[in-house]
Amino acid sequence: MCAVFFAAFAGCKKGGSGEKVGISMPTQSLQRWNQDGANMKAQFEKAGFAVDLQYAGDNDIPTQVAQIENMIATGCKVIVIAAVDGSSLTEVLKTAKQKNIPVIAYDRLIMNSDAVSYYATFDNFKVGTIQGEFLKNALKLDSEKGPFNVELFTGSPDDNNINFFFGGAMSILKPYIDKKVLVVKSKQTSKAQCATQNWSTEEAQKRMENLITQNGYGPKGTKLHAVYSSNDSVAQGITNALVGAGYTKDNFPLITGQDCDKTSVINMLKGQQAMSIFKDTRTLAEQVVKMTSQIIKGEQVDVNDTKTYNNGVMVVPS
């Protein structure tokens, strides 16, 4: 079992003065988003803000849009959004901009909108490289000839983060694929082919089951050495499919992940997932509170990247 700790950002100061902040989270079905919402709410309230925290059902776009509309109508001074679908909020955010309400995209870049004021996130390319390095080292790719069979999974195609997770991992793994030390028997190596709609555990399980059938993987069939997965909800679907195919802890392929979701931690203890990256979202919440305080006070907002995150309309400061 390997849990990698990954922290970013720090520091916040008082400055709420009772101003109301809206927080829009995508779902309560994953432990990660429950923690993010609770962390932000607690830290905003500690800093003196009133908080309207809403979850969009189970990744329901109309629900999230309606909740944001309500936040705009009820006087939120800043709205923090982790989007269900990064491309679905263009129209509702036009209203926010018309009312001069700043919007902070939280760990998922909101696309195709000029109403996004700031983006708070981790170094997600680095997350991908850590996952790729783990597989490289675990399989001893620099010293063993292989070939090692691997399949690739990333997240939702409407989540800009997969460009960084998948890109980071492939920056490590692709040279070994090109040298045929790693072999992707399915030949599904593009981001589009490896995407998992809504980061769905069920969709990941279905795809993994199909890959097992189509490529003859199994404890008594073709050996599958590893499966790259960008996060834990996808990894859990992969694990479910492999368990269903008869794999045990003695022959389980290496599976990567991130978020250290409770189910994945249990799977790691069972030998059914090899690693997960823990991103300390408390530090990200601290940064969001700090940015919001600076916005409310009319101060310059601290950012450290004004080049990387192009949402199709503008580069969003991060």
Per-range role (PLM):
Residues 1-2:
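Sec-dependent N-terminal signal peptides
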Residues 6-9:
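Bacterial Sec-type N-terminal signal peptides, specifically the leucine/valine-rich hydrophobic h-region
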Residues 12-318:
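A residue-level marker of the well-folded mature domains of exported/periplasmic proteins
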